[in-house]
């Protein structure tokens, strides 16, 4: 049996703990918003084997821009110890860096108006790597989906470990092209 959790860490941890205590014996798959460093802390042994996707590296993982993120974390939030920092910081950095890049491109192309940021900023990105463990960004006028590369993680012995990155576009090209459309 498999249980899919489409919620945030605290409610998922509670559900997983309860399922474990009741001996329900199901495997658990969680969404991006539940797969973070707090899940094994909150769910304890019940989180063993939980799998989920993440859209970027976890705090401290070996990716090119992580030293800069860690440096700025120490500089601007010195009271927060490293073990309290989470993937959410990396998500925020990723979002800010993507917007910054789009703004630079739009400005260079003639203006920072809303439509220009989309058309001359985001939609000019092709294989743009943020350096934070996420898939390279490619946006077009007709496709604003992620690149299709999704890292899958598992919790083992209280640690979040990368299993593999799945390339959805390569693995299921027909579904990607014809069914999994969206913005």
Question: Where do the model's predicted regions map?
Answer:
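Extracytosolic ligand-binding ectodomains
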Residues: 1-183
């Amino acid at each position: 049996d498999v249980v899919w959790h489409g919620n945030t860490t605290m409610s998922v941890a509670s559900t997983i703990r309860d399922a474990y205590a009741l001996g329900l014996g199901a495997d658990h798959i969680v969404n991006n918003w539940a797969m973070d460093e707090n899940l094994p802390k909150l769910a304890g042994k019940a989180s063993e084997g939980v799998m989920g996707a993440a859209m970027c590296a976890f705090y401290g993982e070996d990716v090119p821009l992580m030293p800069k993120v860690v440096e700025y974390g120490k500089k601007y939030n010195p009271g927060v110890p490293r073990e309290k920092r989470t993937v959410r910081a990396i998500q925020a950095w990723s979002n800010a860096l993507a917007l910054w890049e789009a703004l630079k491109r739009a400005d260079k192309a003639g203006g920072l108006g809303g439509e220009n940021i989309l058309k001359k900023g985001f939609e000019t990105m092709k294989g743009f790597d943020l350096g934070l463990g996420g898939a390279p960004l490619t946006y077009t006028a007709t496709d604003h989906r992620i690149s299709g590369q999704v890292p899958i993680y598992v919790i083992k012995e209280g640690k979040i470990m990368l299993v593999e990155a799945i390339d959805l576009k390569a693995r299921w090209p027909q579904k990607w092209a014809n069914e999994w459309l969206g913005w």
